[in-house]
């Protein structure tokens, strides 16, 4: 029996008396077994649901279990009485449960409508396309790529089948990790899972026929659609979709005759195709069995959120498929198409939904996430079309930067200073930064349960050098109001000195200012009128025609960094170029951290609290990770309010308009303004004197976890309230205080280098058309890596006709050389990060890491090759190559063709010569993807349940913790769905808690899910994916699954080596763990080799320290097991000398090492004597 627990069924509830026959309130969350009987020979389905689930849920389970369901158009009956879709199971008429709690439902087939017919066809095509790498709607190649199922790691039933190959792999450890030949090509080639559609498909073609649409005279006879199918056997059939089902008709490619042919008909298209094609039936069942035997999450279709596409990959084989071109026609959910949806109304309606009880909150948050994600998907699609010139502008006579677009009910504009708002603050650079800060503030405010004011759905898309802002449309914004009135009710009037303030809006503004710690301050406008401000001067509120108030332009809600502003405003500073803009606001996490520190000091001073007491129980700091923001809990807010009520003297609000030349305060507020300036300086001092130095110190400690790449480093900086612009300050602190910490310095300078590259490449991309992007990027990359000793690249060979069409863009590409490129990159680094990138520093960086970081930041997908080795991977690429789609111009026939022959030969020779010299070729640039910033909030309810679970674990209440753990898991899956980045992170945390609760099997199962979802949504080589593999390895090891543990740890270390290099300090612990796992598998030689690597790394990175001595002692014991007593004696002597020097001769650890030294000395002497005799 298949047991399915839907997400909605996992909320806690009480169970009633299982023997009762009448339903009571306490029975609604009781689980019941359901048998579903079909009208044909389809096997009966059995599964379990709660009585609180609906008949619609039952229907969905049926469709999901069937995978490629033969029946999709049906209703359910109980004792021959039709059941409504939204009827709860427990409310079925005349339902009486026996002691076995089993319900038998019958499937009754319904007549088709055009929508139901399309759904039936769409479901079949969707299932058959699941394994195709191009099936995702993402703009990236192989989006959602997953390695885990292809690792062939033995588990469960296939343990014996795969154990021999796994043992052979284990015997190569650690050589296959630390080898020089380790590369992305070697890593990915055996995971290449591109099925050849012509071999694995169930038919050659299934598409809408050319006889569509159905003529009116046949519509009235019940005809819905006409289909054409080409079977694998090579036969072509024309099929009529009728209200009664599907049948083969007498149509041909030239004759229209939709009458039935023979007796080939069925209510199900699947069953009809099985009659027509034996190979279809055979391959469909093979596909079903293959899907059922594989991992469901790895194979599941991705809906609701954009998956991560790998930055390095193989091209996807392409084939003709009419159904792909007709996907929009076959899509059954017409109401979900972007051009028919009022995005603003949907988003605001979900925000205004009730959220008093748990079920209401679940529904509200689920719809909020779903609606904003649908909006984001449509915004990304529109932004790409906009940049590529496929959407007409509303104001085509304006310059490109000022043009506006409306597409699919979404407003698009460029993130540039089109009207001069930022002319005194940095122009386009300021506008670019302001857009990022604006969406950060919107996402932050979306976390609060505020129905007012309304916030626009917003998405920022960086694509091909352009920053595009996509927003929902304020109702009535394009309409002129009567009597010359304005939509503006709060904020400055554009182009004027007036300020408008509607007092009815003051309450909502006050609430927001309290949440964000913004101080109420006053502003004098051009008419010398004083107005209270609860936000920055730039923020505005508009009144829409729907009666809602919309708050926007939130890019300057947080204070400016006073110290940094002084530094960049110093015109006499000749050390660094001018900073690009003056919007140097601090992050909200820093404001929250400073607020908590001040509140702690206030509590200690006024309530006689211990000075070291922290406020984690009452306040939780703001944390922004990816798309998730973690804010103060409701309990924390209540505690803050309580403190404020106890003593109103506590004041730690900030004036975000300090240091602005256009901010004029009332004369009688001079003292208050001076206090605001003082607070801003205190915040800035706190950042530069405490937060940043402590952050560097925390990363420098041997026991700390150093981020694996720049993405992880930046997330750690944001959690600490540190802006990315302080990377240079962090690097300078390392050079001053920890010059020997080469690893940390390399990590920070790599990120400075990559981000500087991003800005330079972005400027070039913005002026180059789509057809020349691959030439530009390949040429830029070739010039970029000349710093590592590669020769100066030749100019790319651009088709003459294309070069003439885009003459200026071609000249821009030809003008690039390594000298000018590096000059621009170093200038960007000096300007943006106040740090000088020297040639010595650049030479020390890993080129693969730089290439990976550049591709991730710009959205570049490149062909999988070993670019920095002497080995040629042309053969590998040719196996997966797609024919070059560039147009070939051959010229006219006759003599001109003969004259061009020599020219063509010469061109070919120059092209071959160019490809031999250059590392990157235009065909190596496979794709350019958008980089997206969204305003989608994280689920407060799911996070609260997770925090409650952690709290129970700390208190030792394991039973309650286990219950809360299941609830948190259910809430995450209900709100986000299984396939989501936040669910991936939740899986990782929940697996760890399961492990701590000694629920080891559950921990392993959840950790496997975490690995798969991390790979599909965070990237197959992301830092979080690597850590997920390492955690899974440890959980497997605790389950005595040594072989699986070793294989997972090996894969994680390979990723670590590729992403960072061989000298990351945390690999010491990983190799130590791998050694223990190999020891448990009785692979003592391999175990010793891994521990030797850990010892060498520790010696190289940390020197002769206590941790290194501990590793030497472990190594000595392994050497003894391998009967290498001489080497063991040397290792233990090194450990003893280190401990004696660092801890002293009288320390317990030193004495223990001395004991082992004497033991190993005696052992070595005995073995020497035995060898002589």
Curated annotation (Swiss-Prot):
It comes from the Eukaryota. GO terms for molecular function: mRNA binding. Residues 1-25, 888-910 are annotated as: Disordered. The keyword Repeat applies. Keywords: Cytoplasm, Repeat, TPR repeat. It is found in: Cytoplasm. GO terms for biological process: intracellular distribution of mitochondria; mitochondrion organization. Residues 1-21 have a biased composition (Low complexity). Residues 316-565 form the Clu domain. Pfam families: CLU, CLU_N, eIF3_p135, TPR_10, TPR_12. TPR repeats lie at residues 984-1017. HAMAP family: CLU. Belongs to the CLU family. This is Clustered mitochondria protein homolog. It comes from Schizosaccharomyces pombe (strain 972 / ATCC 24843).
């Amino acid at each position: 029996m298949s047991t399915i627990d839907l997400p909605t069924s996992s909320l806690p509830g009480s169970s009633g008396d299982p023997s009762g026959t009448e339903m009571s309130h306490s029975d609604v969350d009781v689980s019941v077994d359901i048998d579903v009987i079909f009208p044909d020979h389809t096997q009966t389905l059995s599964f379990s649901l709660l009585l609180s689930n609906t008949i619609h849920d039952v229907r969905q389970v049926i469709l999901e279990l069937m995978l490629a369901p033969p029946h999709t158009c049906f209703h359910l009956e109980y004792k021959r009485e039709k059941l409504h879709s939204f009827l709860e199971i427990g409310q079925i008429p005349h339902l009486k449960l026996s002691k076995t709690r089993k319900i038998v439902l019958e499937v009754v087939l319904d007549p088709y409508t055009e929508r139901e017919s399309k759904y039936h066809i769409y479901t079949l095509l969707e299932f058959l396309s699941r394994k195709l790498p191009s099936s995702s709607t993402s703009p990236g190649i192989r989006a959602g790529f997953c390695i885990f199922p292809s690792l062939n790691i033995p588990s469960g039933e296939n343990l014996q089948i795969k154990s021999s190959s796994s043992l052979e792999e284990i015997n190569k450890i650690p050589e296959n990790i630390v080898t020089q030949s380790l590369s992305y090509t070697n890593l990915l080639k055996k995971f290449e899972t591109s099925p050849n559609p012509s071999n694995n498909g169930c038919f050659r073609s299934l598409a809408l026929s050319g006889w569509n649409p159905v003529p009116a005279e046949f519509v009235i006879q019940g005809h819905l659609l006409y289909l054409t199918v080409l079977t694998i056997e090579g036969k072509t059939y024309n099929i009529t979709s009728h209200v009664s089902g599907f049948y083969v008709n007498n149509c041909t490619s030239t004759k229209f005759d939709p009458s039935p042919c023979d007796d080939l008909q069925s209510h199900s298209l699947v069953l009809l195709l099985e009659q027509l094609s034996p190979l279809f039936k055979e391959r469909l069942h093979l596909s079903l069995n293959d899907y059922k035997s594989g991992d469901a999450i790895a194979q599941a279709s991705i809906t609701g959120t954009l998956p991560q596409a790998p930055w390095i990959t193989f091209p996807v084989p392409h084939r003709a498929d009419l159904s792909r071109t007709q996907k929009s026609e076959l899509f059954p959910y017409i109401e979900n198409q972007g051009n028919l949806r009022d995005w603003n109304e949907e988003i605001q309606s979900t925000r205004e939904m009730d959220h008093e009880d748990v079920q209401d909150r679940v529904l509200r948050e689920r719809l909020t996430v779903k609606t904003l994600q649908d909006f984001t998907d449509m915004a990304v699609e529109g932004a790409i079309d906009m940049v590529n010139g496929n959407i007409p502008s509303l104001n085509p006579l304006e310059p490109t930067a000022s043009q506006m677009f409306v597409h699919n009910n979404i407003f698009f504009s460029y993130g540039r200073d089109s009207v001069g708002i930022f002319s005194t603050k940095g122009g386009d650079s300021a506008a670019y930064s302001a857009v990022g800060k604006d969406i950060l503030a919107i996402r932050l405010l979306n976390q609060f349960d505020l129905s007012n004011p309304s916030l626009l759905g917003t998405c920022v898309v960086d694509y091909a050098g352009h920053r595009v802002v996509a927003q929902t449309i304020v109702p009535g914004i394009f309409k002129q109001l009567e009597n010359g009135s304005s939509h503006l009710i709060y904020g400055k009037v554009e182009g004027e000195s007036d300020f408008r303030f509607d007092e009815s809006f003051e309450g909502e503004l006050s609430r927001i200012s309290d949440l964000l710690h913004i101080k109420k301050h006053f502003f004098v406008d051009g008419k010398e009128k004083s107005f209270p401000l609860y936000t920055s001067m730039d923020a505005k509120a508009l009144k829409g025609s729907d009666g809602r108030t919309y708050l926007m332009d939130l890019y300057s809600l947080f204070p400016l960094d006073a110290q940094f502003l002084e530094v960049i405003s110093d015109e006499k500073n000749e050390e660094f170029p001018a900073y690009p803009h003056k919007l140097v606001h601090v992050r909200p996490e820093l404001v929250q951290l400073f607020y908590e520190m001040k509140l702690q000091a206030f509590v200690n001073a006024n309530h006689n609290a211990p000075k070291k007491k922290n406020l984690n129980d009452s306040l939780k700091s703001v944390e922004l990770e990816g798309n998730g923001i973690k804010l103060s809990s409701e309990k924390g807010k209540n505690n803050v309010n309580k403190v404020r009520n106890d003593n109103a003297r506590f004041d730690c609000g900030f004036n975000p308009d300090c240091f602005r030349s256009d901010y004029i305060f009332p004369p009688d507020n001079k003292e208050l303004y001076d206090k605001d300036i003082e607070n801003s300086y205190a915040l800035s001092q706190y950042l530069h004197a405490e937060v940043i130095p402590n952050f560097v110190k925390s990363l420098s400690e041997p026991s700390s976890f150093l981020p694996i790449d720049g993405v992880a480093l930046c997330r750690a900086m944001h959690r600490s309230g540190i802006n990315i612009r302080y990377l240079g300050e962090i690097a300078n602190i390392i050079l001053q205080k920890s010059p020997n910490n080469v690893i940390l310095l390399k990590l920070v300078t790599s990120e400075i280098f990559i981000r500087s590259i991003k800005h330079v490449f972005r400027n070039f991309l913005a002026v180059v058309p789509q057809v020349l992007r691959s030439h530009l990027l390949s040429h830029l990359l070739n010039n970029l890596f000349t710093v590592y000793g590669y020769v100066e690249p030749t100019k790319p060979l651009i088709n003459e006709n294309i070069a003439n069409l885009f003459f200026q863009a071609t000249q821009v590409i030809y003008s690039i050389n390594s000298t000018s490129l590096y000059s621009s990159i170093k200038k960007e680094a000096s300007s943006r990060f106040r740090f000088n990138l020297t040639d010595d520093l650049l030479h020390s960086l890993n080129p693969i890491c730089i290439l990976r970081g550049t591709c991730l930041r710009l959205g570049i997908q490149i062909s999988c090759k070993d670019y920095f080795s002497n080995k040629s991977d042309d053969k590998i690429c040719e196996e997966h190559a797609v024919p070059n789609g560039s147009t070939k111009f051959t010229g006219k026939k006759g003599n001109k063709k003969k004259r061009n022959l020599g020219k063509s030969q010469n061109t070919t020779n120059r092209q071959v010569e160019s490809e031999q010299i250059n590392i990157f070729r235009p065909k190596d640039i496979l794709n350019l993807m958008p980089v997206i910033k969204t305003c989608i909030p994280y689920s407060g309810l799911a996070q609260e349940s997770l925090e409650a679970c952690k709290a129970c674990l700390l208190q030792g209440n394991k039973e309650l913790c286990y219950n809360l753990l299941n609830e948190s898991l259910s809430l995450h899956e209900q709100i986000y769905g299984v396939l989501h980045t936040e669910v991936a992170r939740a899986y990782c945390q929940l697996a760890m808690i399961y492990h701590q609760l000694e629920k080891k099997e559950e921990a392993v199962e959840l950790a496997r899910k975490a690995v798969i979802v991390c790979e599909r949504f965070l990237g197959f080589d992301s830092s979080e994916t690597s850590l997920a593999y390492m955690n899974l390895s440890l959980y497997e090891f605790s389950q005595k699954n040594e072989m699986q543990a070793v294989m997972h740890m090996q894969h994680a270390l390979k990723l670590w080596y590729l992403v960072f290099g061989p000298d990351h300090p945390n690999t010491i612990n990983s190799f130590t763990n791998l050694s223990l796992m190999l020891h448990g598998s009785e692979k003592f030689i391999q175990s010793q080799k891994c521990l030797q690597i850990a010892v060498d790394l520790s010696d190289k990175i940390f020197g002769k320290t206590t941790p290194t001595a501990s590793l030497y002692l472990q190594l000595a014991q392994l050497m003894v097991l391998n009967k290498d007593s001489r080497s063991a004696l040397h290792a233990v002597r090194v450990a003893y000398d280190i401990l004696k020097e660092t801890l002293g001769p009288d320390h317990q650890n030193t004495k223990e090492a001395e004991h082992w030294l004497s033991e190993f000395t005696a052992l070595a002497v005995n073995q020497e004597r035995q060898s002589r005799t």
